[in-house]
Amino acid sequence: MGSMEQQQPESAAPATEASPEIIFRSKLQDIAITNTLPLHRYCFERLPEVAARPCLIDGATGGVLTYADVDRLSRRLAAALRRAPLGLRRGGVVMSLLRNSPEFVLSFFAASRVGAAVTTANPMSTPHEIESQLAAAGATVVITESMAADKLPSHSHGALTVVLIDERRDGCLHFWDDLMSEDEASPLAGDEDDEKVFDPDDVVALPYSSGTTGLPKGVMLTHRSLSTSVAQQVDGENPNIGLHAGDVILCALPMFHIYSLNTIMMCGLRVGAAIVVMRRFDLAAMMDLVERHRVTIAPLVPPIVVAVAKSEAAAARDLSSVRMVLSGAAPMGKDIEDAFMAKLPGAVLGQGYGMTEAGPVLSMCLAFAKEPFKVKSGACGTVVRNAELKIIDPDTGKSLGRNLPGEICIRGQQIMKGYLNNPEATKNTIDAEGWLHTGDIGYVDDDDEIFIVDRLKEIIKYRGFQVAPAELEALLITHPSIADAAVVGKQIEPEIGEIPVAFVAKTEGSELSEDDVKQFVAKEVIYYKKIREVFFVDKIPKAPSGKILRKELRKQLQHLQQEA
């Protein structure tokens, strides 16, 4: 994985008054950010103050690991990862194929100590999806659980070491029994080892994202980029998100998703808060945990906000401990905000906006600040501090002023280093001046608040998950009765987003049905990528270059909906 050494484009100097570009910055003052530490040391920098405090609370068992426990166990695991048979070194890659669990957190920071990167994957993914990511990321170690282990490619077991966190199984190592022995002879990785394995621009997290177009790609997030992103949110005298060590943060969102990994796990650890870890989301169980542990901070996504807003049971629960509800991954309308706040009148509800490639947070609601600002319903915050944001005309590239919608671009040390082994996609996303082009259309109003209004990019967003049309199209055309295919998103409720819809051109004489197409895809992809509707057409509209004309398909879809 030597290409992870490719350099992030250098940031241009901050714009001056004479610059023709219109650049927006945070209302909060920039701060000094220590982003040259290894990520694990940065997140645990307050360890001497919080060592005895709860760090991870297992929502299923009630078990508690203190900050001292998490530090000790992650050091022990790091030492085990370095030893045979794993032999992990700087530049290596570990796949974390886990639901939320204490083991997820320990694995992530152990890999950071070794100088390796963690590529996070959804354990509900199909075998094909997992195998593709394993191969693309170059992972040599997989830390997983029995429910996902059977999905791993059997032919790669010689080159792949599998570690299970739950049951013992032939051919696999056991997380606790084989790697985490507590006998005195078992070494702990020390801070002095960091100097041997660390550079702030080394990759530490390798989530997969489809970006603005195409197939999933490895997003190279470095120690520097992630520590910068965390600092932008929770560091300084007046942090953008006013968290503190007395907070109890709910982790109901999957840690394999960058929102949870960064804003819940890393930010929570940075401030010394307790994190209540939910293995699997369930609305009743979530409300139980809020009551039992007096949760104060609840990072959610719009579908969960909607579920709480519509839940009759929520009114009978004591959710009064919650003081802050962060919503991200998809836009949310005012009617849902109002219905939700009726259930939690004592909480502040606000939205943020992110993109995996941006580290991921671009903007955050300033009502969460230690010294809060008034904010508007429907806004997704203002740009984070120590960063620059501009709105450009998608056709001309010219920067636009306030209240003019255009493509959102972000620049700062929090953005990705690039896409793994894909310089062309990197070049198409981060320009020569260091601006990351998001593919989202939005505007900045007179109060510096950002509103998302449309999507320039092809990616479909369903319940906060990314669905890449190109991935589904590549699968569809492998069917012997499909001559050509294209996939677009069909907007349903704003809080849910879009569903994948396929336009299919059948081979001559084919009797292929809509159910045939749906079932063919469903066997190969995770649930949120399933095709929900199929329309048969004579041919797929394409430009002379062969590029699918998705605007034409969206017009056809709109016409079909009107006819229905």
UniProtKB/Swiss-Prot annotation:
Positions of the UniProt region annotated as SBD1: 282-351
PROSITE patterns: AMP_BINDING (PS00455)
Catalytic activity: (E)-ferulate + ATP + CoA = (E)-feruloyl-CoA + AMP + diphosphate; (E)-4-coumarate + ATP + CoA = (E)-4-coumaroyl-CoA + AMP + diphosphate; (E)-cinnamate + ATP + CoA = (E)-cinnamoyl-CoA + AMP + diphosphate; (E)-caffeate + ATP + CoA = (E)-caffeoyl-CoA + AMP + diphosphate
Tissues where the protein occurs: Expressed in roots, stems, leaf blades and leaf sheaths.
Positions bound to (E)-4-coumaroyl-AMP: 259, 263, 329, 351-352, 356, 364, 457, 461
Residues involved in ATP binding: 209-213, 217, 351-352, 356, 440, 455, 547
Pfam family, one: AMP-binding
GO molecular function: (E)-caffeate-CoA ligase activity; 4-coumarate-CoA ligase activity; ATP binding; CoA-ligase activity; trans-cinnamate-CoA ligase activity; trans-feruloyl-CoA synthase activity
Keyword set includes Nucleotide-binding: yes
Residues covered by region (SBD2): 352-419
Recorded superkingdom: Eukaryota
Pathway listed: Phytoalexin biosynthesis; 3,4',5-trihydroxystilbene biosynthesis; 3,4',5-trihydroxystilbene from trans-4-coumarate: step 1/2
Alphabetically ordered keywords of this record: ATP-binding, Ligase, Magnesium, Nucleotide-binding, Phenylpropanoid metabolism
Gene3D superfamilies named in the record: 3.30.300.30, N-terminal domain of ligase-like
Keyword Magnesium in record: yes
Binding of CoA, residues: 280, 463-464
Induction: Induced by fungal elicitor and UV irradiation. Down-regulated by wounding and UV irradiation.
EC number(s) per entry: 6.2.1.12, 6.2.1.34
Cofactor: Mg(2+)
Any single biological process term in GO: phenylpropanoid metabolic process
Similarity remark: Belongs to the ATP-dependent AMP-binding enzyme family.
PANTHER family: 4-COUMARATE--COA LIGASE 1, LONG-CHAIN-FATTY-ACID--COA LIGASE
Domain notes: Both substrate-binding domains (SBD1 and SBD2) are involved in the substrate recognition, and are sufficient to confer the substrate specificity.
Protein function: Involved in the phenylpropanoid metabolism by mediating the activation of a number of hydroxycinnamates for the biosynthesis of monolignols and other phenolic secondary metabolites. Catalyzes the formation of CoA esters of cinnamate, 4-coumarate, caffeate and ferulate. Is more efficient with substrates in the following order: ferulate > 4-coumarate > cinnamate > caffeate. Cannot convert sinapate to its corresponding CoA ester.
The name this protein goes by in its record: 4-coumarate--CoA ligase 1
Organism: Oryza sativa subsp. japonica (Rice)
Record gene name: 4CL1
